[in-house]
UniProtKB/Swiss-Prot annotation:
Record function comment: Receptor for lysophosphatidic acid (LPA). Plays a role in the reorganization of the actin cytoskeleton, cell migration, differentiation and proliferation, and thereby contributes to the responses to tissue damage and infectious agents. Activates downstream signaling cascades via the G(i)/G(o), G(12)/G(13), and G(q) families of heteromeric G proteins. Signaling inhibits adenylyl cyclase activity and decreases cellular cAMP levels. Signaling triggers an increase of cytoplasmic Ca(2+) levels.
Subunit structure: Interacts with RALA and GRK2. Interacts with GNAQ and GNA13. Interacts with CD14; the interaction is enhanced by exposure to bacterial lipopolysaccharide (LPS).
Species of origin: Homo sapiens (Human)
Lineage: Eukaryota, Metazoa, Chordata, Craniata, Vertebrata
Protein name: Lysophosphatidic acid receptor 1
Known tissue expression: Expressed in many adult organs, including brain, heart, colon, small intestine, placenta, prostate, ovary, pancreas, testes, spleen, skeletal muscle, and kidney. Little or no expression in liver, lung, thymus, or peripheral blood leukocytes. Detected in lung fibroblasts from bronchoalveolar fluid from patients with idiopathic pulmonary fibrosis. Detected in bone marrow-derived mesenchymal stem cells.
Positions bearing Phosphothreonine: T351
Membrane topology: Multi-pass membrane protein
Membrane topology, Cytoplasmic segments: 76-83, 145-163, 226-255, 316-364
């Protein structure tokens, strides 16, 4: 009998059921997970939380309005009915969704987090993961499209509308899957010892995977744009020896350089700190990552606000369409190219092609 009684405590270990399966905590409160991870769960609004929430809501509104303007501009102006602009519109849609996700977060954070259930907390985080993954995937798709276009010496790719739709569907499918993975099982609800400090219901392994996935995507984008720039610079220098307009070539090269620096700089500034913070949360237990979490979250949010400016507002034709929409004006010539856009080669793809075809001043 003594031998039998000593085996009973082994069967009733707190983390395992009688069937030797891990114990799950689906019915626990959010406070339970936050207390275990050591993350402070506010009971009332302090000054910093109010400032962060106010700034976050303001940025969310700007994100939604700016990206809605981009989508409407691409829809109403037939000059933008090309694959690159469809991808830009999809990028705007992803960033618009990011604005909605952050807007939902702002009203379910701070003391309001206590009211969430496990399911609603995972939904809140899943919306953010989905929107941010879609934005990054769209940036990568645009980089690949520009790379193909430049090296084939085309103004626009010959990709059919059907293929563009397939690319967009793949982007959103991947984004939804990435956002849903924690909700369908890759979390720490049944592995309570491996919960993240920053995201108390997320598994450390998932956050490492998600951070590395985005950092690898960033590296691929850097390589693609560096390859584009190197190719255009080489072509420009070669043609300047046989062209009567070397000054134009230098200006085109500098314009491309500025655009690439803005694109890559915005991505680095907005994304890298938060992704590194996720890795530090897992790999550096002594690091106080929670002290910087809210600020880096806002920084990542700013990327969705910058994308319309970087990819669209530098285009003079896009700017003119913005003014027409905001002033409720009708386009005088919705089907043909404008003289201004012909002269300036204002969009990013016009700029790239101008460097390749330095002797051809007609880009349409």
């Amino acid at each position: 009998m003594a031998a039998i009684s000593t085996s009973i405590p082994v069967i009733s270990q707190p983390q395992f059921t009688a069937m030797n399966e891990p114990q799950c905590f689906y019915n626990e409160s959010i406070a339970f997970f936050y207390n275990r991870s050591g993350k402070h769960l506010a009971t009332e609004w302090n000054t910093v939380s109010k400032l962060v929430m106010g700034l976050g809501i303001t940025v969310c509104i700007f994100i939604m309005l700016a990206n809605l303007l981009v989508m409407v501009a691409i829809y109403v102006n037939r000059r933008f009915h090309f694959p690159i602009y469809y991808l830009m519109a999809n990028l705007a849609a992803a960033d618009f969704f990011a604005g909605l996700a952050y807007f939902y977060l702002m009203f379910n954070t701070g003391p309001n987090t206590r009211r969430l259930t496990v399911s609603t907390w995972l939904l809140r985080q899943g919306l953010i993961d989905t929107s941010l993954t879609a934005s990054v995937a769209n940036l990568l798709a645009i980089a690949i499209e520009r790379h193909i276009t430049v090296f084939r010496m085309q103004l626009h790719t010959r990709m059919s509308n059907r293929r563009v739709v397939v690319v967009i569907v793949v982007i959103w499918t991947m984004a939804i899957v990435m956002g849903a993975i924690p909700s369908v099982g890759w979390n720490c609800i049944c592995d309570i010892e491996n919960c993240s400090n920053m995201a108390p219901l997320y598994s450390d392994s998932y956050l490492v995977f998600w951070a590395i996935f985005n950092l690898v995507t960033f590296v691929v984008m850097v390589v693609l744009y560096a390859h584009i720039f190197g190719y255009v610079r080489q072509r420009t220098m070669r043609m300047s020896r046989h062209s009567s307009g070397p000054r134009r070539n230098r200006d085109t090269m500098m314009s491309l350089l500025k655009t690439v620096v803005i694109v890559l700089g915005a991505f680095i500034i907005c994304w890298t700190p938060g992704l590194v913070l996720l890795l530090l949360d897992v790999c550096c237990p002594q690091c106080d990552v929670l002290a910087y979490e809210k600020f880096f979250l806002l920084l990542a949010e700013f990327n969705s606000a910058m994308n319309p400016i970087i990819y669209s507002y530098r285009d003079k034709e896009m700017s003119a369409t913005f003014r027409q929409i905001l002033c409720c004006q009708r386009s005088e010539n919705p089907t043909g190219p404008t003289e201004g856009s012909d002269r300036s080669a204002s969009s990013l793809n016009h700029t790239i092609l101008a460097g390749v075809h330095s002797n051809d001043h007609s880009v349409v």
